[in-house]
Amino acid sequence: MLSALAVLLAATPPGAREQTTVIMPEEPQQRQIHEDWGFAQAIIAGETIHVSGVVIGAPAEGASLQDAYDRGFARIGDILKRSGASWHDVVEIISYHTDVTTQMAPMIAVKHRYVKAPYPAWTAVEVSRLIPDRGITEIKVTAYIGGRKQSTTAP
């Protein structure tokens, strides 16, 4: 009976995460945070890249919201690059905002510098708070790197 169970377990295909590539931060302090909290910066599953939410903090003194968003979008761009993708491969953006009224215009201005047509799907949600508490916006993206053909827009 036990030998039959062992054969069944050995024949079981690996789980989905065992067939993925995990992208972790290069900076030791950030990597430790990800390991302590138990999450990847990004994960490549087949031809899809799932980037964990990147939290944009309140702008430093003398900086603008656009400056803060630019740092966040650049960080996402770096994660995409290390995952073998770029902003052109992004098919979905989900953003969480603590104040949609003041954050949307600067976010859109910066997004237009990084994200070009054909545009990905985008959902923006207002939330009461983010982790860490100094966070004002969190941006999560999904990229698709399969079938890298010339993109076209529908009429």
Describe these PLM feature segments.
Residues 2-91, 97-155:
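N-terminal presequence-like segments and the immediate start of the first folded domain
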